Amino acid sequence: MNTELLEKLKKIQLECAKKVIARDDFEKVETIGGMDLTFEKINENPTRAWASLVVVELKTLKPVYQHVVKDIVDFPYIPTFLAFREMPLLLKLYETAKVKPDVYFIDGQGIAHPRGCGIASHFGVETGEVTVGVAKSKLFGYAKEPAPQRGSYTYLKYKGKIIGAVVRTKDNTAPVYVSVGHRISLKTAIDLVLKTSKYRVPEPTRLAHNLLQVVRRKELRR
């Protein structure tokens, strides 16, 4: 990947960051959709990939809809440029889904990104949907470890600015990294993540991940 192209992609991310709405910009939340992707060979390019959406009811956490798409991904894995690898497939998933949840949880970063526009923010700005970034590891910033009890959290910061939260979703279990994607406040994002978490990973993205593992195994046996 040449330097000139990377600079163009950085500019796209910086422009995206300017469009992020980091406040609650919706009326209600009754359903939440989890989105996830998996690759046949993550370090190869091009490679086959699958993306899934599982929609759950907020009150019951029971799944009410699921959808999977597959395609060839033809953009290399480059740290901090994940959106350019995954967005085409996520958009295909979004556009072909028959159910649109009130909020999308995306396995990745929102504004907790060096240029303020990770995959969750990129997807939100592109589609206009309400999105939250829920990642299993930290990409950017610094934070203290939250207390070991479920519901504890600390703020993820960079240069004194809050860019996300480190949230303990289960007692004595590794935290998740929550950040604003688009059209939501960090406070509400944290609240929704905790409301939807039975285990470490919130149910919408956990179920989306589990669905992908089943689909991927079946596909690779063919």
Swiss-Prot record:
Cellular location(s): Cytoplasm
Entry binding sites for Mg(2+): D36, D107
One Pfam entry name: Endonuclease_5
Keywords tagged on the record: Cytoplasm, DNA damage, DNA repair, Endonuclease, Hydrolase, Magnesium, Metal-binding, Nuclease
Alphabetical list of Gene3D superfamilies matching this protein: archaeoglobus fulgidus dsm 4304 superfamily
A GO term for molecular function: deoxyribonuclease V activity
Residues carrying the site annotation Interaction with target DNA: Y77
Cofactor: Mg(2+)
EC number: 3.1.21.7
One Gene Ontology cellular component annotation held by this UniProt entry: cytoplasm
GO biological process, one term: DNA repair
Entries under InterPro entries matching the protein: Endonuclease-V (IPR007581)
Catalytic reaction annotation: Endonucleolytic cleavage at apurinic or apyrimidinic sites to products with a 5'-phosphate
UniProt function note: DNA repair enzyme involved in the repair of deaminated bases. Selectively cleaves double-stranded DNA at the second phosphodiester bond 3' to a deoxyinosine leaving behind the intact lesion on the nicked DNA.
Family of this protein: Belongs to the endonuclease V family.
Official protein name in the record: Endonuclease V
Native organism: Aquifex aeolicus (strain VF5)
Gene: nfi
